[in-house]
């Protein structure tokens, strides 16, 4: 089980990250960039922002406790992780993946 304190430590363990309020959730983002995950204390869940392909792979690990967010964000890869039942290593891997997408330099398209 991963509780709020453990999740905060994991999310903030990546370089240049910060915790910010996000509606009723805690948001974790790269400073001066976008969020890579949010945490909801009342049900101990995290929404981790993956690619749709990564989302599919993580959902295959545990279809009951890892699933797409049920809205447009979920179609884009936002994935709910129920932290009471998921191994820390799985959550850490998902957070690292989401973090890497945020820090990755954007490629410029030429016309």
Model-derived regions, located:
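Charge-dense, helix-prone N-terminal extensions
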Residues: 1-111
């Amino acid at each position: 089980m991963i509780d709020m304190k453990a999740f905060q430590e994991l999310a903030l363990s990546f370089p240049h990250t910060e915790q910010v309020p996000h509606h009723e959730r805690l948001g974790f983002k790269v400073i001066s960039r976008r969020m890579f995950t949010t945490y909801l204390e009342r049900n101990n869940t995290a929404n981790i922002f993956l690619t749709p392909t990564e989302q599919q792979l993580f959902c295959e690990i545990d279809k009951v406790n890892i699933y797409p967010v049920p809205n447009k964000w979920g179609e884009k890869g936002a994935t709910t992780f129920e932290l009471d039942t998921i191994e820390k290593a799985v959550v850490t891997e998902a957070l690292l993946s989401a973090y890497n997408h945020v820090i990755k330099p954007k490629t410029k398209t030429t016309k």
